[in-house]
């Protein structure tokens, strides 16, 4: 199992304090996954907390500037993953307590790329992060979907 997580990383290239996060964004790490059996994407929380721009729905012809916005970056992420791993099951884990704009964007973009969304609920948290109990609940909710 490979867990490829960076603390504070965003899907898009915009990070906290409007810093350039292209060195750690999800969209710039897709080539590092190797040959996975399954891909679980748990993102959007830091994009929301960093107040990254939402951007427009855009499904191709991305320019560098577009990827500093959440929607085009998520579309590029899923497009790249589908191209690199056409036979791998991909799931998006949608955290609870995000802005409706993020939730709706994730659902719409994931639908375009046929990526199931696992919407988390009732996750016990402390300072916005899952507690041990919350992580167990998260695991249970994800396993319930991927074991089908």
Where are the language model's segments positioned?
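Loop/turn elements at helix/coil->beta-strand transitions in domains of secreted/extracellular proteins
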Residues: 1-2, 34-39, 85-90, 113-116
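Conserved SGNH/GDSL esterase-like catalytic core that processes O-acyl groups on lipids
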Residues: 1-59, 63, 129
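Residue-level recognition of beta-strand->loop/alpha-helix junctions
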Residues: 3-5, 94, 119-121
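Short, electropositive alpha-helical surface patch
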Residues: 25-28, 99-116
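Active-site segments of SGNH/GDSL-like serine hydrolases
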Residues: 42-52, 74-107
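The substrate-binding groove and active-site-proximal loops of carbohydrate-active enzymes
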Residues: 60-69, 122-130
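Aromatic/hydrophobic pocket-lining residues that form the small-molecule binding cavity
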Residues: 70, 74, 135
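Histidine-centered active-site loop/cap adjacent to the catalytic His
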Residues: 126-148
